[in-house]
Amino acid sequence: MKEYKVGILGFGTVGAGVADCLLNNADVIAKRTGIKPELAGIADLDITTDRGIRIPAGLLTTDASELIHHVDVVVELIGGTTVAKKFILQALGEGKSV
């Protein structure tokens, strides 16, 4: 089974929902798709606010550029056209799926 390390950029309401889905449904996703997603990290400027879900230690970072280096798939949930665009272009330049 193919495994993909997934990095989330942006940890607001939608980012927290995606993280929760990946953390709690990875086995279901793997069974249905043949691809096992592993939440490898979450980048956001604010990593201290409680988002209502339990995130394993070491997954939160403020360094999105560094996170991009260590994942296979980047889920961009920052929004906008400036910072988000910068990270998307970086990820694509590194051959990541976005």
Where in the sequence are the language-model features?
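NAD(P)-binding Rossmann-fold cofactor-contacting core
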Residues: 24-53
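Conserved acidic residues
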Residues: 40, 58, 72
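Nucleotide donor/acceptor-binding cores
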Residues: 2-4
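N-terminal Rossmann-fold NAD(P) dinucleotide-binding loop
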Residues: 15-16
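Rossmann-fold NAD(P) dinucleotide-binding segment
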Residues: 63-73, 77-98
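Hydrophobic Val/Ile/Leu positions in short beta-strands of Rossmann-like dinucleotide-binding domains
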Residues: 6-8
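Glycine-rich, highly charged phosphate/nucleotide-binding loops
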Residues: 56-64
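Glycine-rich Rossmann-fold phosphate-binding loop(s) that bind the pyrophosphate
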Residues: 11
